Design a protein with these regions (language model features):
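Conserved beta-strand segments that form the floor/walls of ligand-binding pockets within enzyme
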Residues: 71, 106, 111
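Conserved beta-strand-loop-alpha-helix junction that forms the acyl-donor binding cleft
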Residues: 143-152, 171-174
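Conserved acetyl-CoA-binding loop-helix of GNAT-fold acetyltransferases
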Residues: 109-112, 118-135, 140, 154-158
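Extracellular-facing segments of soluble proteins and assemblies that are Gly/Ser/Thr-biased and enriched
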Residues: 51-77
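Conserved acyl-donor/pantetheine-binding loop and adjacent beta-alpha core of acyl/acetyltransferases
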Residues: 65-66, 73-105
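Conserved active-site alpha-helix within GNAT-family acetyltransferase domains
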Residues: 147-165
Length: 189
């Protein structure tokens, strides 16, 4: 009862909000491996559109210019996909939610097929795609994760990523632009 009242009061005062944790993986911290995971491969727009699993195929629009996509297959069947954005595409589409410097990219989306959830597919894909991005010269990778999505936190943390910030956007009094507040959580950018 009190929780619902508090939520209503917060919405009245702050308007719509977003709350994301920012995760970071530096190239030096990327998991070292002599052998890449053979089940994680780069994938392009055409490959994504051809996927049989609609939960994965419907995210094909995330691929393209300034995007690097990877697909994890389990027993020969695509189980998860992820997309890193950088450059102009990231700046244009994300409203610079988290600023990126050169040689930095943001993991914009990761999707796991419902049949593969709870089996470590996301963790494997996050870890291996980060390793491959680092090997390709990307120095720092970021991702934003909704504040209450515990399964995503766990996947990133098991993959070796560190939570570095909390970003809140609030829109008090229905302003034209929301206020964005960034709180560091113990690691410099």
């Amino acid at each position: 009862m009190w929780t619902q009242a508090l939520k209503r009061a917060a919405r009245l005062l702050c308007g719509d909000y977003t709350a994301y944790y920012i995760y970071r993986q530096a190239a030096a911290a990327a998991p070292a491996s002599d052998r890449p995971d053979p089940d994680v491969l780069p994938i392009d727009s055409q490959g994504l559109a051809a996927l049989v699993d609609p939960h994965l195929a419907e995210h094909a629009a995330y691929a393209g210019v300034d995007s690097t996509a990877f697909c994890l297959s389990v027993a020969g069947t695509p189980a998860a996909v992820c997309f890193f954005w950088a450059g102009e595409r990231y700046r244009r589409h994300s409203q610079a939610f988290w600023p990126l410097a050169p040689a930095q990219a943001n993991l914009m989306q990761i999707v796991t097929s419902p049949r593969a959830r709870g089996q470590g597919a996301a963790t494997r894909l996050i870890a291996e795609s980060a390793r491959r991005m680092s090997a390709a010269g990307w120095q720092v990778l970021y991702a934003r994760v909704w504040h209450s999505h515990v399964a995503s936190w766990m996947a990133f943390e098991r993959a070796g990523w560190r939570r570095v910030a909390l970003v809140l956007e609030i829109n008090p009094w229905r302003r034209k632009s929301p206020w964005r507040l960034r709180f560091a959580l113990g690691l410099d950018r």
